Amino acid sequence: MQIIDGKQVASQVLEEVERDIARLREQGITPGLAVVLVGEDPASQVYVNSKVKKCAELGMNSRKIVLPSDASQEELLRIVRELNVDPSVHGILVQSPPPPHIDEAAVVLEIDPAKDVDGFHPENVAKLVLEDETGFVPCTPLGCMRLLKAAGIETAGANAVVIGRSMIVGKPMAHLLMSKQANATVTVAHSRTKNLPELCRSADIIVAAIGRPAFVTADFVKDGAVVVDVGINRVEDASAKRGYRIVGDVAYDEVAPKCRAITPVPGGVGPMTIAMLMANTVKACRQQTGA
């Protein structure tokens, strides 16, 4: 059984990104990422700070813009419009989820698709479906594909089941797996899917992205399957230092022995998300500057 080490693969991606940034800087170009946060959600603050820190480590410019939790929709849209026309900013990310009074879809629509390094704008969604590589793919599914490639997993002709149909992971993951580059046969499962364990047992590759701790158990998985666990769930644990531990959507201890390969949580898909965000930002910089 192979444990797919996301930290190691992310490190390789970031080394490539750092080399790309160094080459761009030799031409007088420094990629720039702007991250906008509305409110004081502690988890969002951690995510934003980790992105800003990673930019600095790689030699990339970053800008963190924090708005109060009662900031208006129009105020947020105004900032996005300013960033759209700022030539020093190549990637724009509005940290999700925003406060309830903010219309997230409207914010995504306001971001220039050329700077939408999250890959959520309808133009980039269309490019993913059309397999137009000038678009941006959401970072988590892009990272999952890189993990499969790094682990030497053959996707062509494989039966893949993606559990979850979100715009952030499930749907783009399905499109990536069925693309002409991957050539898998894909089933997307969700809360209304019948006989889910039986369906999953037919899969060579399972991608779990539903946000339910330890949902995928051993009876979902055939011997020799590959399991990619996208879930990041906090579970109360009095014995843990913080009072909780992080677990995935897969019951790792019982599923792993059956697998040909599996991603752990933490240390699997998680590190790939920020690595692919950095890669998307460099790609955006290149496309905008013609470098």
Swiss-Prot record:
Self-association and partners? Homodimer.
BP-aspect Gene Ontology terms? L-histidine biosynthetic process; methionine biosynthetic process; purine nucleotide biosynthetic process; tetrahydrofolate interconversion
Pathway it works in: One-carbon metabolism; tetrahydrofolate interconversion
Annotated NADP(+) binding sites? G164, R165, S166, S191, I232
**What family does this belong to?**
Belongs to the tetrahydrofolate dehydrogenase/cyclohydrolase family.
Q: Which UniProt keywords apply?
A: Amino-acid biosynthesis, Histidine biosynthesis, Hydrolase, Methionine biosynthesis, Multifunctional enzyme, NADP, One-carbon metabolism, Oxidoreductase, Purine biosynthesis
Protein name, please? Bifunctional protein FolD
Entry's EC annotation: 1.5.1.5, 3.5.4.9
Q: What's this protein's function?
A: Catalyzes the oxidation of 5,10-methylenetetrahydrofolate to 5,10-methenyltetrahydrofolate and then the hydrolysis of 5,10-methenyltetrahydrofolate to 10-formyltetrahydrofolate.
Check the record and name the HAMAP family matching this protein: THF_DHG_CYH (MF_01576)
Its recorded reaction(s) are: (6R)-5,10-methylene-5,6,7,8-tetrahydrofolate + NADP(+) = (6R)-5,10-methenyltetrahydrofolate + NADPH; (6R)-5,10-methenyltetrahydrofolate + H2O = (6R)-10-formyltetrahydrofolate + H(+)
Q: SUPFAM superfamilies recorded for this chain? A: Aminoacid dehydrogenase-like, N-terminal domain (SSF53223), NAD(P)-binding Rossmann-fold domains (SSF51735)
User: Cellular component terms, GO, for this chain's entry?
Assistant: cytosol
Gene3D superfamilies, alphabetically? Leucine Dehydrogenase, chain A, domain 1 (3.40.50.10860), NAD(P)-binding Rossmann-like Domain (3.40.50.720)
List the molecular function annotations (GO) for this entry. Answer: methenyltetrahydrofolate cyclohydrolase activity; methylenetetrahydrofolate dehydrogenase (NADP+) activity
